[in-house]
Amino acid sequence: MESTLGSDLARLVRIWRALIDYRLKPLELTQTHWVTLYNISRLPQEQSQIQLAKAIGIEQPSLVRTLDQLEEKKLITRHTCANDRRAKRIKLTEDSASVIRELDGVIESTRNEILGGISREELAFLSTLVQKLEQNIIQLQSR
């Protein structure tokens, strides 16, 4: 019988993300918005869109729509890089700090609820397995 681990993991990510999106809906934000804001807030100031896309692990064109939405919500600003007119620098606005705190609170409480009833040891073991799977995949990709 064929293993369904890949499908199981994909489904888990899909329903986890759907729950986050549902819980962020009152804030008129999504999990994608949160991931983007989270990464912007943790990277050195005024990263380029290219650097941000690499940090998130997506292609730059995929990021542009999310950045457009965040700019419309006045959570970020973008301006042309002085050294390279093709590059755009991203900066969080003052308004974004309180929104990011609120987002982080929703994400953290949701994570705690999802992981309820799972021991620290079980989580550590799961994390080790996921890291091993990731290493195996990276090695296979480099062949």
UniProtKB/Swiss-Prot annotation:
HAMAP family: HTH_type_SlyA. This is Transcriptional regulator SlyA. Gene3D superfamilies: Winged helix-like DNA-binding domain superfamily/Winged helix DNA-binding domain (1.10.10.10). Transcription regulator that can specifically activate or repress expression of target genes. Regulates the cpm operon, which contains cpmA, cpmB, cpmC, cpmD, cpmE, cpmF, cpmG and cpmH, involved in carbapenem-like antibiotic production. Pfam families: MarR. Disulfide bonds: none annotated. Keywords: Activator, Antibiotic biosynthesis, DNA-binding, Repressor, Transcription, Transcription regulation. Homodimer. Residues 2-135 form the HTH marR-type domain. One of its GO terms (biological process) is response to stress. SUPFAM superfamilies: Winged helix' DNA-binding domain (SSF46785). GO terms for molecular function: DNA binding; DNA-binding transcription factor activity. It comes from Photorhabdus laumondii subsp. laumondii (strain DSM 15139 / CIP 105565 / TT01) (Photorhabdus luminescens subsp. laumondii). Residues 49-72 bind DNA. The keyword tRNA processing does not apply. Belongs to the SlyA family.
